[in-house]
């Protein structure tokens, strides 16, 4: 399997890291990769419709279209087929580059328009029954761990730019060898940040050559709760001790997160 495809799979796994959002179904040196993504897209009356998207990336991908299967309990079989056709039409405009995340974002933004088309049955009863599934994503929070930064100044500047461009707030935190990024914002914007982090050359390797980030992990992701502090900006902070870092988490309402996810990094 080509390295760019492996990198795309790695980025997708980091982005779709919620419960049951991502599953690799098969990996083969002869047949390529097959994986499943669970997501939601806005349907009729601002209701969220759960979608199961199965992608098959053949060995010639991204020089050819991926195979796509669409399933949803809240859409008819005919509607699922129309959604698949529209996704493939969009994929034709993205050939020669990694496209899966772009396709997921596209269907999230365009499903309601597709379902309004006459061939999709307009406002069918099957779709309107999803009214009870309405979910307001609101503000989300993600904690990331970086293994190292060799080109620290450039890396920090890049992270600050991404956070600003995507309207994300939070902290880039340094304490000894520990590097953490705490992000707050729209869930799709956080996922877009993750794909940038995974696919752009943000650091240098041991020989000084520019390289992509391969050692990032998502420690935690949740919807922001009432006890969590809302950050007004994205700031870079350095801490001289573990106690000082712990106090930052405690004042943010994340004491449990610190004990469960951060402490194990220093053990």
Swiss-Prot record:
It comes from the Eukaryota. GO terms for biological process: negative regulation of NF-kappaB transcription factor activity; positive regulation of hypoxia-inducible factor-1alpha signaling pathway; positive regulation of protein sumoylation. PROSITE patterns: RWD. GO terms for cellular component: cytoplasm; nucleus. Enhancer of SUMO conjugation. Via its interaction with UBE2I/UBC9, increases SUMO conjugation to proteins by promoting the: binding of E1 and E2 enzymes, thioester linkage between SUMO and UBE2I/UBC9 and transfer of SUMO to specific target proteins which include HIF1A, PIAS, NFKBIA, NR3C1 and TOP1. Positively regulates the NF-kappa-B signaling pathway by enhancing the sumoylation of NF-kappa-B inhibitor alpha (NFKBIA), promoting its stabilization which consequently leads to an increased inhibition of NF-kappa-B transcriptional activity. Residues 7-114 form the RWD domain. Interacts with UBE2I/UBC9, NFKBIA, HIF1A and NCOA2. Its main location: nucleus. SUPFAM superfamilies: UBC-like. The RWD domain is required for the sumoylation enhancement activity. It is found in: Nucleus; Cytoplasm. The gene is RWDD3. Pfam families: RWD. Keywords: Cytoplasm, Nucleus. This is RWD domain-containing protein 3.
């Amino acid at each position: 399997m080509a390295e760019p495809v492996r990198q795309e799979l790695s980025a997708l796994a980091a982005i779709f890291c919620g419960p049951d959002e991502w599953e690799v179904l098969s990996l083969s040196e002869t047949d390529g990769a097959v994986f499943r993504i669970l997501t939601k897209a806005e349907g009729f009356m601002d209701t969220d419709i759960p979608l199961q998207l199965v992608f098959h990336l053949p060995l010639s991908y991204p020089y050819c279209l991926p195979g796509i299967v669409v399933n949803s309990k809240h859409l008819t079989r005919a509607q699922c087929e129309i959604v698949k056709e529209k996704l493939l039409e969009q994929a034709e405009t993205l050939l020669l580059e990694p496209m899966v995340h772009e396709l997921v974002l596209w269907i999230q933004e365009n499903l309601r328009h597709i379902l309004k088309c006459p061939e999709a049955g307009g406002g069918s009863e099957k779709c309107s029954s999803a009214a009870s599934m309405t979910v307001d994503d609101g503000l989300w929070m993600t904690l990331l761990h970086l293994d190292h930064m060799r080109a620290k100044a450039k890396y920090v500047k890049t992270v600050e730019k991404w956070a600003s461009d995507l309207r994300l707030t939070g902290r880039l935190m340094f304490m000894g060898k520990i590097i953490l990024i705490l992000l707050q914002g729209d869930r799709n914007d956080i996922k877009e940040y993750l794909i940038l982090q995974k696919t752009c050359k943000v650091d240098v390797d041991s020989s000084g050559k520019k390289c992509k980030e391969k050692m990032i992990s998502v420690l935690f992701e949740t919807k922001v709760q009432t006890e969590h502090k809302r950050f007004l900006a994205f700031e870079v902070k350095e801490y001289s001790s573990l106690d000082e870092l712990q106090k930052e988490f405690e004042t943010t309402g994340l004491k449990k997160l610190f004990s469960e996810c951060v402490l194990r990094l220093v053990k």
